[in-house]
Amino acid sequence: MRQTQCLLWLFVLTCSLAPYGASQRRDPLNAKEIDEMREVADYPDKRLELMTGFARGRIASIEQLSADPKSAKDRPAQIHDLLQDFTSLLDEIDDNIDMYGSHKTDMRKGLKLTIEASSEWQLQLRKLKQQAPPEELGQYSFVLTNATEAVDDTAESARKELQTQNELAKDKKLNKTYSERPD
């Protein structure tokens, strides 16, 4: 009887905390960035360019935090959050590559930009890992590893899609905008 009550109490507690954990996930984009993304919904090159710029901004913020001795107190938490945002942006880039690629929408310029940026990001993340104080690195090493893997995945998917797009372009089978796609 007592064991059943404990299990029931544990179940109720778990169910009541589940929505709290789910609501803690942050949107990596601010309101202005979201509006910018909406404006270019039919233009994959521009979307990839924007998202790449947003991701570069997160990396630049991480580099500024790392160099600022005044931010030492809460720097690990801020870097952790920025790395999570960066990884979410890369996941969004991958989703866009998949979506626009499946509809044969031309995004070769954006893919090239993403591939170039991926090389930069790999170097910047490696530098962060090497130069971070060990006591700080321990607080965000997991998300740093996730971010590094996400960069590798994004670069690989962008390269594959660019190759596919180049082949489709030879046969003139690419749509200029997403709205031209055959449904």
Question: Each predicted region: which residue ranges?
Answer:
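Bacterial N-terminal signal peptides that target proteins for export
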Residues: 1-9
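Bacterial Sec-dependent signal peptides at the C-terminal "C-region" and cleavage site
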Residues: 3, 15-25
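Bacterial N-terminal signal peptides
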Residues: 8-16
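Long, charged/polar, soluble alpha-helical segments
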Residues: 22-183
